[in-house]
Amino acid sequence: MAEKKRPNVVLIMTDNQPADLLGCYGNQEMRSPRLDQMAAEGIRFDNAYCPNAMCSPSRASVWTGRMPSQHGVHTWLDDRLMDQWPAGWNAVAEFDTLPEILKRAGYATAMIGKYHLGALAEAQNGIDHWITMARGHTLDFHGNEMTVNGESFVYDGHSVDFFTEQAVQYIDARAAQPDEPFLLLLPYNGPYGHWPSIKGRAEHRFGDLYDETPMHSVPREGISKEAIALYEMNKEFMSSKKGGPDFSALLQIPNDLTSLRNYYSQMSLIDDGVGQVLDALARGGLEGDTVVIFTADHGFSLGHHGFWGHGQATWPSNMFRIAYNIPLIVRAPGAIGPDRSSERLVGSMDLYSTILEYLGLFEETDMADVPARSFAPELAGETFDWDDVVFLEQEESRAIRTTEWLYVKRFKGSGAYPLEDDLYDLNADADERRNLAGDEGYAAIERELATRLDAYFDRYADPRFDLWRGGSAKSNASRPWLWKDAWGPDW
């Protein structure tokens, strides 16, 4: 008897999107009908978290199943340093990545979208079909240089539409070869949420969709002292005149309704793209043989806690829910029951092990030092043991999050930059407003959580990339001044 064909996998990832930016997660102003429908046809995870709230580290963790202190990518890989990278440099080359494992198992593999893990001109990590943009971050959604299997050209239209078109074409081609399973990685470069990409009115077919929306789903909080501290810090270390970003935008965007509506419209454009991908699967007869996963690289504050952006949008880095809580929806008609939700604490990094177990490939790689856990039984509706905990890290900040507590430990090895810890009681303070760290009444729980956090990083952090012990970051770090103060000017 012939071996049963393994299911296809489509893994869709957005760029800078909190779970809160979807209708199915409770945002009444967001128009996301296709993703809401996808959630109704599958399972929605309400407590999914990324391990790091920056683009490159979180993507590396999904591809490798490892934390940043293991794979060495601690922040976004700076496009301005690309000419300093070795030819063909791949930030996760030494690891057995998800596409490489599936390729060995007979899968056709495609990556269509934002890569941001190294050199872009040629395919990496066992990818057969390679389509990406010529830079990691998005300055404009239009007029981007694209690379299609080694050939480069400028695409005048919207990059999200381009990636959708290419994904649909790929699925149509795979439908002609239904006996060969495929992996399609589709990391969109939207909705993004930063100037200049969302400054002004959106120039696409959903550009006017939110013209009459009051945007009450975006908090109007005062700018936090931590956001201002980052702005002041970066005026010295990463000023615009030195080629760095204009951090004043982080203070201005929450009060610019046009930009907010632009950002929301970019998400609706992606929602439409996801719908086209799902339609292509159905049209090609692949719907019942494909597991589709939708998630984001990391969360994004829309003004919550007085800042706009990701985990490193404040000084010190924050570990609040809004910056780490991501959407996670999984649909596989006939294999995963419809209209389900899960409250389990899971990580996007866990997708590595989950996909492998779901496909029956868990034994095809060495998992000894892989902290990613498999929640595949949850997809099947099975009963299984699960520890509701996720671990997070953002250079100088590390955290453990349980159903009851969020504890943030900060690096203490710098005399010039003293940092304090955070502790939040999530039952009494779900919005994470009252810091209990240092309160004698909570000293025991703080010690317990600190012990668990330290044990986790003692077990998994690679000394080469453990910043807290003098290790380095691949390509670049976001807080070099801190690490030079701690470890010396040659760090």
PLM features per residue range, with description:
Residues 7, 11-14, 18-110, 135-138, ...:
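Active-site segment of extracytoplasmic enzymes that catalyze sulfate/phosphate-ester chemistry
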Residues 14, 24-29, 43-67, 74, ...:
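Short, solvent-exposed turn/loop segments enriched in Gly/Ser/Thr/Pro and often Arg
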Residues 123, 128-129, 134-137, 300-311, ...:
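C-terminal cap/loop subdomain of S1 sulfatases and analogous C-terminal strand-loop tails that border
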